[in-house]
């Protein structure tokens, strides 16, 4: 039962007034102004049910069509030996997404707009443009997955792709946030279809558990090929669009700092589901192809469906194809929304699922246009779908480190997060993650640019040489943690702002009232190195893709 209490709302930076009001979740409502303590388990449960959504959608949406292919490739080519990569990614997923949910609840402003305001027009424009391009390509891969599943099911590809695109547009365009969230949550629960497939294939549970816990490399496999697949797993599981989506979706759902604890639990549940799905795909694919001629010869997600149908049964193959369509639908919805939210946020345009199409034309135009273009590309004969998939994987690898750097800097920005800035140890961990992502990004970029030269020795040289970069990252982390510590003390001890004494009520003030961002020398160094890296790596990757497109790669 919700208790409505009249309170004085603090002045915040929220850019769209549709982001203020009742929390209307798929499974419950929290009234605007409800500040009553949750003293009973029943009250806590009803609150959690109302909050559920952002974490589940962003995590399960990450198990999209591209993820099906990546995890399936790992299982078909290397068995369950790479399951441990998923275990290592659990803390990375939580730390990254917890930071953005905190930013969303505390600031009320989207990720791209904060980058504009705190780091300038160059980085703001860069973040929006690269997000738009990468997301557009990612959505194409979602419809590739839908087309492959339709082919297996024997359904007309053109009709199926058009119907899927229309369904995604209609679900978001009703002007009812709760209705969209219920649609998304239905897709989330449908993703559990992977679990019965796992039991139908019945891979050896003891082996699956062992390989999930104990790291190892496939025996007799080429290190460079394995490393590239590991990078693919990382890029599939931790993607830039997730940061932008969850921050904006938390804002659109009207979640405030008072409910961050519940949103963190929502995130943990989402992580559990995404790991269960990923483990299931890798494990039952490994068991399906073990000892068969197709083992080690991955083609695409459609090939996995064919193999499951051949060796396990038609029912299991159909279930996999349906799960693939489900994954592509939720992936396309979330990725498109992350782009529309970002553009609306940057231009201070209306950008909320609470608004009808006529009340937020630009927001829905961006959303619908991305879906329509992606569907059209997949249906166009002769489209370079393989090249587009390669471009998505490579660009994601190049851009992910920069997205994490911005995230780390924003979460140490005193005027932005006040008492919610990062702890010292969180900065240490995130900096280590950035170092690892940079190394993996370099390996991925090198493999695309120089496929014939990327052998075991090159990879080892990159990993060893990366130790120096890791040391620099550690120094940056120390500098940032010092700033963060001072930020927390300043926020809590500021007697002129009583709200700062309570983390539950502290919100970022309007953007125009923020003190100018003051970057430390370490942060400025980060930005300079990052800019150089992006110019070089991005330029080389673009050149390579163009060469491949014209047949000279």
Locate each region found by the language model.
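Flexible loop linkers connecting adjacent transmembrane helices
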Residues: 30-36, 70-75, 97-123, 178, ...
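Juxtamembrane transmembrane-helix boundary signature
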Residues: 58, 85-118, 126-133, 137
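Loop-to-transmembrane helix boundary motifs in multi-pass membrane proteins
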Residues: 121-122, 158-163, 269, 315, ...
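Transmembrane alpha-helical segments of multi-pass small-molecule transport proteins
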Residues: 128-132, 152-173, 193-194, 361-373, ...
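C-terminal membrane-solvent junction of multi-pass transporters and transport-like membrane proteins
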Residues: 186, 355-365, 390-449, 486-489
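Hydrophobic alpha-helical segments and their helix-loop junctions in multi-pass secondary transporters
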Residues: 189-217, 227-247, 406-414, 437-448, ...
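A generic transmembrane alpha-helix motif of multi-pass inner-membrane proteins
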Residues: 225-228, 425-490, 531-538, 544
